């Protein structure tokens, strides 16, 4: 009985001396179809670092501003906006290299313009006056890049007929697939993952044009994470590509590996954002 009490006391003492380790909180601010892949990635990084890790769905940029999230999977457009608002609040860690021959082993992706396979459209120019689905205004591949493309053609959004905002790439894909809209531009990674999960999709949709390449959405650390921990997270993410089991996990998200990335890589998005914003009439 005395021994039992001593063991319990030791456990209590150990708990007091070694308080529970704070979990490493990852958040997915990208398409929900990437959540299973990124949840597994987060768990593997946690195991590599010897800390508990969890993935949550990102619900608002305040999570990045206040540091309630440690690491985030984030689109390049909100990234450049947020660091423009407060330099240093986010640190680029890595970006995925996709298993897509068009990407040429670089951290880039495309905005694929999709239509139904049985539609008559063969090029972006043939979509004049047709119904179009944007993702949402904060999406680079699903909105801003299309607006930039229209400007390069000397056009405005009046080029399209009816415009809708779907709120996510998967919904844009669904609406094109069902014929609710004629066309949309979607993240090439999301489209690739949807094709992996639903092979019938490839027979129902066609890509008539690809905008890009553009620097791909990235993984960032918030200011809540110490510099040494940021470096360890970056290294753990990069090492996933050298482990056969982890490579299978990455493949479910069409990812070949993660590679280090820096802020300058997103200058292409900054430039396109500046062009689009300068074209918006003031007042």
Label each residue range with its predicted role.
Residues 9, 21-28, 32-40, 228-283:
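An extracytoplasmic/periplasmic, membrane-proximal ligand-sensing/linker region
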Residues 23-48, 58, 76-77, 105-172, ...:
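Bilobed "Venus flytrap"/periplasmic-binding protein-like clamshell domains
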Residues 144-147, 151-156, 165-177, 202-204, ...:
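Hydrophobic, well-ordered secondary-structure segments
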Residues 73-87, 152, 177, 182-202:
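A ligand-binding cleft/hinge motif common to bilobed small-molecule-binding domains
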Residues 1-20:
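N-terminal amphipathic/basic-hydrophobic helices that include classical n-h-c signal peptides
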Residues 28, 94-103, 107-110, 199-235, ...:
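Periplasmic-binding protein-like
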Residues 65-125:
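Acidic, polar ligand-binding/catalytic clefts
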């Amino acid at each position: 009985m005395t021994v039992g009490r001593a063991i319990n006391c030791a456990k209590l003492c150990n708990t007091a001396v070694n308080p529970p380790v704070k979990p490493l909180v990852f958040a997915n601010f990208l398409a929900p179809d990437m959540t299973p892949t990124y949840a597994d990635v987060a768990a593997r990084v946690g195991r590599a670092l010897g800390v508990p890790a969890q993935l949550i769905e990102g619900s608002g940029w305040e999570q990045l501003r206040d540091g309630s999230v440690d690491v985030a999977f984030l689109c390049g457009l909100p990234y450049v906006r947020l660091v423009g608002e407060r330099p240093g609040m986010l640190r680029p860690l890595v970006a995925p290299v996709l298993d897509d021959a068009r990407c040429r082993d670089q951290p880039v992706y495309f905005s694929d313009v999709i239509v139904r396979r049985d539609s008559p459209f063969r090029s972006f120019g043939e979509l004049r006056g047709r119904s179009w689905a944007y993702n949402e205004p904060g999406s680079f591949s699903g909105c801003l890049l299309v607006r930039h493309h229209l400007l390069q053609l000397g056009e405005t959004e009046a080029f399209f007929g009816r415009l809708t905002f779907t709120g996510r790439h998967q919904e844009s894909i669904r609406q094109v697939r069902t014929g609710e809209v004629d066309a949309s531009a979607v993240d090439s990674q999301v489209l690739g993952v949807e094709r992996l999960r639903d092979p019938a999709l490839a027979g129902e949709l066609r890509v008539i044009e690809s905008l890009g390449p553009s620097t791909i959405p990235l993984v960032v650390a918030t200011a809540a994470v110490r510099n040494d921990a940021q470096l360890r997270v970056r290294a753990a993410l990069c090492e996933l590509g050298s482990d056969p089991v982890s490579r299978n996990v990455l493949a479910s998200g069409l990812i070949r590996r993660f590679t280090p990335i820096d802020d300058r890589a997103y200058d292409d998005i900054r430039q396109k954002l500046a062009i689009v914003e300068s074209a918006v009439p003031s007042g």
